[in-house]
Amino acid sequence: MDRRPSQYSSEEEDDEIEMYEHDYDGLLSKGKRHLGKTRWTREEDEKLKKLVEQNGTEEWKVIASFLPNRTDVQCQHRWQKVLNPELIKGPWTKEEDQRVIELVHKYGPKRWSVIAKHLKGRIGKQCRERWHNHLNPEVKKSSWTEEEDRTIYEAHKRLGNRWAEIAKLLPGRTDNAIKNHWNSTMRRKEEQEGYLQNSSKTNQHTIVTNFPKSNHLMTFTHTRASAEHSQASTSSFPYYHIAEHQNASYPVALRVNIVNVPQLATAPVQRHYNDEDPEKEKRIKELELLLMSTENEINQKQELLNHTASYTTCHSTTIGGNPRLHGQSTPDSCLGDPHHSTPSPQVDHSCLPEESASPARYFGVNLLIQMKNLAEYSETQLIDSFLNTSTQHENLEMEHQSLTSTPICASQKNTITTSLLRDHALRLQKENHLLRTPAIKRSILNSTPRTPTPFKNALAAQEFKHGPLKLLHHTPLHLAEDIQEVIKQETDESGIVHDHCNTEEPLLKRIKQEVESPTHKVGNLYFSSYWEGESLNAQLFRQQSTLDDTSNSILTSSLLMKPVSEKEDHIFKSFPVQSIKSYTSPLQHLSGTWDVMSCSRMEDQKILAEQYCKYIKNFSTLVI
């Protein structure tokens, strides 16, 4: 069996032979050619170590003869890159980096095996990767640009994963760096988001403007209107160029009232480099919807402004000294469309605060109107311009309507014209159905009063007549106290004589004992039948359903029909006859028929009526 010669050239590419560090149970990577190669097993590694100890590190052909299906080159690489105990796999030190730089200057950037011999514990592959990834001053370490991404995208469509060939098209970028950039960033964006697929279409529709870069800013000169305002020139709009490495941040642009003019050629790519926020795509879509709704609203307001009368102001003010006062807008060269212009009315800044009267902010509003005339524009820069102007424009529109309707002087703030009210009403009625919930008109809800329910009326009448209701716990102690308090109160009001109540046992206590005593219950049944026979045609109770009062009929009849003793008879006789009504419950005063049906006016039933009036109050609280 022929063996390959032992060739470990200093110029060889170590990536051609893949080595594995003790990953015995792993799988071979897909997409690579394996010429009869399999992973090294533990037995092969142990056997290789013993053979190296016996034969040294020079006789690789002899060592390979003891290992079936292994060549001398495979055995040599396995020992030098994996099994050699002198290998250093930790981080590089400053001394090692300095040594690599000196050796590369001496031997060149390709003789890595020779360079590795001067660095103990390092192999040629480690030295090569350290040089190209960290130490080579010619290798770019900056962020990837749009042109580089487009070059990689086009080359990858033609060459595939031939990174060495692609690296020749990008000076300053290594094949390893290009491969990592493609696998980590570009492939995902290209497959999921269609990154750079529409770049050719974008270049075809690019509109030539006066600005070769996207870093031009426009400033404004805020001057009062005078008789010489017709002689002003466009020099009031100077342009300032910012270098490529300088960028005006959003807070700075907001503070100095800067509006970024959109650059049309770099629309789909800039958001990829500005921020790596994963949620930025969602926010961009939301801003696009908000921008569309705002633009539609501004267009409708612009139509209303075209029909308004001439503007009368206390102190007329022009924007930036532009001589085109009526029917014209910002210079067409700013927006890249010299054929379309939108009228921009004069603005009375004397009625507004100094900050809100900035002409740059008003220009930002006009910028959104001009965007509809552009064939294509930069999404990122338009969003920046929208962020700088939309919020302040909405605040001005809510608080100071002089920008969207007839200006009002300081002396005329209290007198709002009909046109202002009409414009304000139209703005309030328009709702954005995409991003905002439609407002509920409270005037419709509150136009008619709500009719209170009869239950609320009854409660109100009860509280007005007897005071607020009190909720008490239903305990026997509280019920006894409440009954005594009610009896005492009604006794004081009706002039009841209660001399015997102080000397003898309370009537309520004795009644309770009689009810709880089983002997009295039997006696009450007997006396109940006796009294029912005595009262011939007397109607003691109101005609009600027997199903409602079945559980209490025996108790009430036994209590009310019991013969009255001499002492009780003396107490009852001391009550005036006209005070019978006062023993009814306060709730019973609501119905006058209750007294007629329940308390008879006959002489032979006065005692029974008095007893009934006393016990009917405790009807729902007595327990059988």
From Swiss-Prot:
PROSITE patterns: HTH_MYB. Residues 264-314 are annotated as: Transcriptional activation domain. This is Transcriptional activator Myb. Comprised of 3 domains; an N-terminal DNA-binding domain, a centrally located transcriptional activation domain and a C-terminal domain involved in transcriptional repression. Residues 315-449 are annotated as: Negative regulatory domain. InterPro entries: C-myb_C (IPR015395), Homeodomain-like_sf (IPR009057), Myb_dom (IPR017930), MYB_TF (IPR050560), SANT/Myb (IPR001005), Tscrpt_reg_Wos2-domain (IPR012642). It comes from Xenopus laevis. It is found in: Nucleus. GO terms for cellular component: nucleus. Residues 32-83, 84-139, 140-190 form the HTH myb-type domain. Pfam families: Cmyb_C (PF09316), LMSTEN (PF07988), Myb_DNA-binding (PF00249). Residues 319-352 are annotated as: Disordered. Residues 60-83, 112-135, 163-186 bind DNA. Keywords: Activator, DNA-binding, Nucleus, Repeat, Transcription, Transcription regulation.
